[in-house]
C-alpha cells in the first residue's frame, strides 16, 4: 500500500499546491468510517485559479495544531484537562524513588503526574513446575523440591484449571514459534495450542507433547555469531552478575586510574599554588619549574591500554538518523521497530552506574539488544567517513549510563566493556533533568561541574578498552546562563587542569546537545540557533582553524578520537523530514537524535529516508502496534507474565502514539511537535480510537492483539489527566 504524501508548506500558508496555488482536496470525507487505501493527495485543477481578493487564508494559530474545521469536536466550557509533560520519557523508570517523597506530602487533587504507579501482576493462578515446562506429559524432569514444591506437576490439570485459555489473536499461532520454530515459554505459552499435539504411546495412552518446526528453526539462524537463541545479544552471564553482587569482581583499571586521579588532584593544587607564589615574587624560573612538575606528573600517569586515537572508530552522517535513549519507552521491541523503519543507531535506556556495579538484574537487562541492532549501519557510498573506520566492525547499539562520582562511572564502564563488549559506544548522560538524579549530582547536575565531568569522561576512556566514549548534554541548567559552548570546547580540547598536566584531550568521540536547559524542560521549543553555534565551534575545532590563544591547549593527536574528529549531534523537536533536513543542512550537525518525534510516529525514520510526509492510514499504524506486540512476546515471553509485560510497555508507547494527528487532517504543514490539538475525530472509527487520550481506549487497542487483560493487571497513566488542553496561548 503506497503511503499518502502531502506537500510541504510554510507555517503561514494553508495546505495548497505551491506550484499552482490550489488547495489540496481531501481524499476522505470526514464522516466516512470505511478506510480507503492511502494515496497521494489530489490537487485542484490549476486552470481555475482563485482570483477573489477578499478570500484571504486564515493565519496559523501559534501553539495550536491546525486541524481542519470539519474534524474538530467542540468541547464544553470548563472541561479542558491539564496538558501532558514529557519529562517522563527521560526518567520514568526512576520516578518511583521520587514518588516516595511525594507520598509523604499532603494529599492533592488528582492532577499532574502519577509518581507512585503500580501495574499489578499477570501470573497463572498456580504456576507449572519448572521441571515440566518443556517436557512431554509422561517424561517430566526431576523436581528439585520434591513433595515440598508449591507448583503444579500435573500438566492436564495445569492447562485446564490454572492457565487462562489460549489467545485467539495472531490467527491462533504463537508469534515466537512462528518466527523461531520453537516457543521458549513451553507449556506456559498463551498460544500453546499452536505448537502442541496429542500422540498415542505404545501402551495406548494419549500423551501431550510440544511440537517444534525444523524448517522454521533453520530460517531463524542468528544474524550475528554472538546472538543467543532468542535473537538477542549483549547478555551478561548470570555468574558475572552474581559475582558483582557479592563484590567478587575486580576492576583493576578503574581502581588504578582512580588512585592516579586522586593523587594528581593533590599535585595539581600544589602546581597551581606554586605558580601563584612565583608570580607574586616575580620568579624568572617559574616556567621551567612548571614544566618540571608537569613532567613529574606525567611520569606518574597511568597509560591506558587504549588511547582514544586507538579505539574503534565510529561514523555519523546525514543518512544515519539516531533514536535517542528513552527511559521506559526505549525498550528492545520499540528499538527493534525503529531499526526496521530506518533508524540507524539506538541506545539503551539510561542505566544507573551503582546498580550495574552491584550486578542488579534489572539494570543489566537494559543492555540487552536485538540482533538487528548488532548489524553495521547503512551508510551512503562515498560517505565522509574518518580514516581507519571499519564499517564491518561497527554496531548500531550503544549503552547510556548515569553517575555522580568518577569511580562509579569508571567501574561501570569497566564491567560493561568486560561483559558486554559488543557495544558501539558508552554514552554518559549529562542532560537528564529529573530532580532525583540532579540532587544526587548526576545527569544535568554535571553541567555545573565541567572539571568533574571532564575527569569522568577521561577516566571512562581509560578503562573502556576499544569502546568509544560519548556524552549527551543540555544547553545548561538555567535559562539565562547556557554553558554548552564552553563545555563543548573543554570536552574536545581539555580544560586548564589538563593542559597544566599535559594530558591532552579527554577523547570524547561524539557529543550530543539537547537544545534546552534543565529549567526549561519542554515548556518551549528547542533552541536550534544555539545548537548551530555549537556545531560551528566544533567544526572549527575539528578543522584546527580556531585560533587557540594558549597553544599548550592544542591536543595531543594520540588523545583525539576518530583521527581528530569529534562528531556532533543535535537533539530537540525533530518531527518531520523537513526538520531533519533543515538541522543537517543549516544547523551544521552531523546528524539528528530523535526522541519524542519517534515515539509519536516511529515512521519518522521512513519519512527521513523518503524525503516526504507519509500519511499512514489507521490500519497501517495498527499494524505497527501488532508488530510491537509480536516483538514484545519474543522479548519477554508468550506466557502470562510476558503478555502482561508486553501489554504494559505497549500502553506506555500508546500514551505517546495517541498524540499523532494524521497529515490529512491538518490545514497547514509542517506539523509541530509542540502544538496542542483541539479535540478531533478521525476519518474513520479506528483513526479516532487511535487518537484517543483516554487510557481505557489504549487498553482496548492492546486487547486486539493480547486478549483481555489479566484480572490483576493494573495500568495507571503517567498523568492523572491524560489529554491535551483545548486552548493554548497565542
UniProtKB/Swiss-Prot annotation:
Class of the enzyme per the UniProt entry, highest EC level: oxidoreductase
UniProt cross-references to Pfam families, sorted A to Z: Dus
CDD domains from the UniProt entry: DUS_like_FMN (cd02801)
Annotated spans, Disordered: 1-126, 274-299
Cofactor: FMN
Catalytic activity: 5,6-dihydrouridine(47) in tRNA + NAD(+) = uridine(47) in tRNA + NADH + H(+); 5,6-dihydrouridine(47) in tRNA + NADP(+) = uridine(47) in tRNA + NADPH + H(+); a 5,6-dihydrouridine in mRNA + NAD(+) = a uridine in mRNA + NADH + H(+); a 5,6-dihydrouridine in mRNA + NADP(+) = a uridine in mRNA + NADPH + H(+)
Active site: residue positions: 432 (proton donor)
Gene Ontology CC annotations of this record: cytoplasm; nuclear periphery
InterPro entries on file: Aldolase_TIM, DUS-like_FMN-bd, tRNA_hU_synthase_CS, Znf_CCCH
Zinc finger (C3H1-type): 123-156, 174-195
GO biological process, alphabetically ordered: mRNA processing
Residues the entry annotates as binding FMN: 325-327, 400, 472, 514, 571-573, 595-596
Biased composition annotated in UniProt, kind: Polar residues: 1-12, 48-57, 111-122
GO MF annotations, alphabetized: flavin adenine dinucleotide binding; mRNA dihydrouridine synthase activity; RNA binding; tRNA-dihydrouridine47 synthase activity; zinc ion binding
Functional description taken from the UniProt entry: Catalyzes the synthesis of dihydrouridine, a modified base found in the D-loop of most tRNAs. Specifically modifies U47 in cytoplasmic tRNAs. Catalyzes the synthesis of dihydrouridine in some mRNAs, thereby affecting their translation.
Annotated protein name in UniProt: tRNA-dihydrouridine(47) synthase [NAD(P)(+)]
Protein source organism: Aspergillus oryzae (strain ATCC 42149 / RIB 40) (Yellow koji mold)
Gene that specifies this protein: dus3
Amino acid at each position: 500500500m503506497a503511503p499518502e504524501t502531502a506537500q510541504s508548506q510554510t507555517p503561514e500558508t494553508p495546505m495548497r499546491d505551491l506550484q499552482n496555488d490550489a488547495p489540496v482536496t481531501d481524499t476522505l470525507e470526514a464522516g466516512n468510517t470505511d478506510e480507503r487505501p492511502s494515496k497521494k493527495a489530489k490537487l485542484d485543477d490549476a486552470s481555475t485559479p482563485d482570483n477573489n481578493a477578499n478570500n484571504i487564508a486564515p493565519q496559523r494559530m501559534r501553539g495550536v495544531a491546525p486541524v481542519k474545521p470539519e474534524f474538530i469536536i467542540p468541547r464544553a466550557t470548563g472541561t479542558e484537562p491539564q496538558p501532558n509533560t514529557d519529562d517522563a520519557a527521560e526518567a520514568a523508570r526512576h520516578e518511583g524513588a521520587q514518588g516516595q517523597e511525594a507520598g509523604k506530602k499532603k494529599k492533592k487533587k488528582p492532577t499532574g503526574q502519577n509518581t507512585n504507579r503500580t501495574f499489578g501482576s499477570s501470573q497463572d493462578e498456580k504456576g507449572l513446575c519448572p521441571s515440566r515446562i518443556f517436557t512431554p506429559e509422561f517424561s517430566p524432569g526431576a523436581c528439585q523440591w520434591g513433595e515440598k514444591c508449591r507448583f503444579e506437576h500435573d500438566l492436564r490439570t495445569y492447562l485446564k484449571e490454572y492457565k487462562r485459555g489460549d489467545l485467539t489473536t495472531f490467527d491462533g499461532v504463537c508469534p515466537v514459534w512462528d518466527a523461531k520454530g520453537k516457543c521458549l515459554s513451553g507449556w506456559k505459552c498463551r498460544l500453546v495450542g499452536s505448537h502442541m499435539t496429542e500422540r498415542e504411546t505404545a501402551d495406548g495412552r494419549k500423551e501431550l507433547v510440544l511440537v517444534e518446526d525444523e524448517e522454521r528453526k533453520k530460517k531463524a539462524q542468528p544474524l550475528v555469531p554472538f546472538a543467543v537463541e532468542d535473537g538477542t545479544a549483549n547478555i551478561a552471564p548470570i555468574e558475572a552478575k552474581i559475582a558483582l553482587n557479592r563484590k567478587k569482581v575486580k576492576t583493576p583499571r578503574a581502581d588504578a586510574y582512580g588512585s592516579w586521579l586522586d593523587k594528581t588532584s593533590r599535585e595539581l593544587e600544589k602546581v597551581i599554588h606554586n605558580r601563584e607564589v612565583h608570580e607574586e615574587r616575580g620568579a624568572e624560573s617559574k616556567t621551567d619549574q612548571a614544566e618540571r612538575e608537569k613532567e613529574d606528573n606525567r611520569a606518574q600517569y597511568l597509560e591506558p591500554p587504549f588511547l582514544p586515537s586507538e579505539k574503534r572508530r565510529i561514523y555519523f552522517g546525514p543518512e544515519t538518523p539516531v533514536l535517542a535513549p528513552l527511559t521506559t519507552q526505549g525498550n528492545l521491541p520499540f528499538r527493534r521497530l525503529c531499526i526496521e523503519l530506518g533508524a540507524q543507531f539506538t541506545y539503551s535506556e539510561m542505566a544507573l552506574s551503582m546498580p550495574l556495579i552491584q550486578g542488579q538484574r534489572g539494570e543489566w537487562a537494559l543492555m540487552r539488544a536485538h540482533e538487528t541492532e548488532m548489524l553495521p549501519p547503512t551508510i551512503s557510498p562515498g560517505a565522509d567517513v574518518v580514516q581507519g573506520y571499519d564499517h564491518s566492525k561497527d554496531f548500531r547499539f550503544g549503552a547510556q549510563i548515569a553517575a555522580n562520582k568518577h569511580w562509579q562511572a569508571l567501574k561501570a564502564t569497566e564491567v560493561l566493556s568486560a561483559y558486554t563488549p559488543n557495544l558501539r559506544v558508552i554514552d554518559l548522560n549529562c542532560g537528564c533533568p529529573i530532580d532525583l538524579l540532579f540532587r544526587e549530582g548526576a545527569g544535568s547536575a554535571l553541567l555545573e561541574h565541567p572539571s568533574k565531568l571532564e575527569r569522568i569522561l577521561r577516566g571512562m576512556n581509560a578503562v573502556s578498552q576499544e569502546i568509544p566514549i560519548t556524552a549527551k548534554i543540555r544547553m545548561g541548567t538555567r535559562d539565562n546562563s547556557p554553558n554548552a559552548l564552553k563545555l563543548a570546547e573543554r570536552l574536545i580540547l581539555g580544560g586548564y587542569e589538563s593542559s597544566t598536566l599535559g594530558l591532552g584531550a579527554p577523547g570524547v568521540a561524539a557529543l550530543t546537545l539537547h537544545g534546552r536547559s534543565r529549567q526549561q524542560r519542554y515548556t518551549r521549543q528547542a533552541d536550534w540557533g544555539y545548537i548551530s553555534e555549537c556545531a560551528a565551534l566544533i567544526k572549527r575545532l575539528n578543522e584546527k582553524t580556531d585560533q587557540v590563544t594558549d597553544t599548550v591547549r592544542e591536543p595531543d593527536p594520540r588523545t583525539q578520537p576518530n583521527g581528530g574528529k569529534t562528531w556532533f549531534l543535535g537533539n530537540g523537536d525533530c518531527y518531520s523530514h523537513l526538520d531533519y533536513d533543515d538541522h543537517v543542512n543549516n544547523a551544521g550537525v552531523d546528524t539528528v537524535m530523535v526522541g519524542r518525534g519517534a515515539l509519536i510516529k516511529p515512521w519518522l525514520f521512513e519519512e527521513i529516508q523518503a524525503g516526504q510526509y507519509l500519511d499512514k492510514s489507521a490500519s497501517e499504524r495498527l499494524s505497527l502496534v501488532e508488530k510491537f506486540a509480536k516483538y514484545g512476546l519474543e522479548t519477554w515471553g508468550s506466557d502470562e507474565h510476558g503478555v502482561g509485560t508486553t501489554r504494559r510497555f505497549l500502553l506506555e508507547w500508546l500514551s505517546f502514539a495517541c498524540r499523532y494527528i494524521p497529515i490529512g487532517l491538518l490545514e497547514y504543514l509542517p506539523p509541530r511537535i509542540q502544538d496542542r490539538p483541539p479535540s478531533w475525530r478521525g476519518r474513520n472509527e479506528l483513526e479516532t480510537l487511535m487518537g484517543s487520550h483516554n487510557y481505557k481506549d489504549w487498553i482496548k487497542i492492546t486487547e486486539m492483539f493480547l486478549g483481555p487483560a489479566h484480572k490483576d493487571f493494573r495500568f495507571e497513566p503517567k498523568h492523572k489527566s491524560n489529554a491535551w488542553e483545548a486552548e493554548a496561548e497565542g
